[in-house]
Amino acid sequence: MIVSTLEHILTHISLSIVSILITIELRIFLDDEIKKLYDSSERGMLITFLCITGLLANNWIYLGHFPLSDLSESLIFLSWSFALIHSIGYFTKNLKFLSTITSQSTLFTQGFATSGILTKIQKSSILIPALKSEWLIMHVSLMILGYAALLCGSLLSVALMVITVRNDGKFFFKSNNFLFREISYQNKNFFYAINYYKTQLIKELDFWSYQVISLGFIFLTIGILSGAVWANEAWGSYWSWDPKETWAFITWIVFAIYLHTRININLQSTNSAIVASLGFIIIWICYFGVNLVGLGLHSYGSFPSTSN
């Protein structure tokens, strides 16, 4: 009873704080002068991170195993991963765009994980035999940490593409009229300042997208390898082309291509951002879409069947 009440309190506190922080983050993103508001937002996100950490610890004690055995539990861990990335970014300057992404990602995943949609698959304290292994924590946690980092990096790439497309647009209407030419001349410095700011923002988005995706790719690679070892112990085969395994491999290939485009100077920035944006969709198919189908060896984490 106490454990259940504590879980309820921690869940709603974390969800409420993040909901408030989203409004603050969006306001801060548009105004560089709100220092106190920014500090309050960061402290609030740290509190959210601690609440979700407490929620995971509470569930671990209640269930008797680390809470990563179904979709609901993995979503909570995913929201914790977003909050962790946000907390790391707190100690790095000029990362407000990353904070905006991670705070909203935390809200959506935490909100969905604790919603009534997943009620039927929550609180299953009995593990299937394949999950009763020390590999559970290592494999699943690394995969979800990898997904979280790759999703954040991909969203930075999406933002980069949007800004790049708008930056390439024409700010002036071509006209031979003297009045329009005069206005264009007077506002030239203003538009140069805007373009300079956008150029610097694009460079920062490109740099941090690459850094975050590289980190996520490392987690994903180790997660897949550890999963292969675990699969051999549990099912007698390192790889069985299970739907989840197949899409995890596709995800790995997509982001391997992304890293290749980063090595090739001619394919950097916009081209690599396109690949990362595609990867954003692929990750959700791998993580969430396969669970909707509920087929294969990983179907224990899927939605429950509605038919009896």
From Swiss-Prot:
Pfam families: Cytochrom_C_asm. GO terms for biological process: cytochrome complex assembly. It is found in: Plastid membrane. The chain crosses the membrane at residues 2-22, 44-64, 71-91, 143-163, 212-232, 247-267, 273-293. Keywords: Cytochrome c-type biogenesis, Membrane, Plastid, Transmembrane, Transmembrane helix. GO terms for cellular component: plasma membrane; plastid membrane; thylakoid membrane. Its main location: plastid. It comes from the Eukaryota. InterPro entries: Cyt_c_assembly, Cyt_c_biogenesis_CcsA, Cyt_c_biogenesis_CcsA/CcmC. It is a multi-pass membrane protein. One of its GO terms (molecular function) is heme binding. Belongs to the CcmF/CycK/Ccl1/NrfE/CcsA family. HAMAP family: CytC_CcsA. May interact with Ccs1. Required during biogenesis of c-type cytochromes (cytochrome c6 and cytochrome f) at the step of heme attachment. This is Cytochrome c biogenesis protein CcsA. It comes from Cuscuta reflexa (Southern Asian dodder). The gene is ccsA.
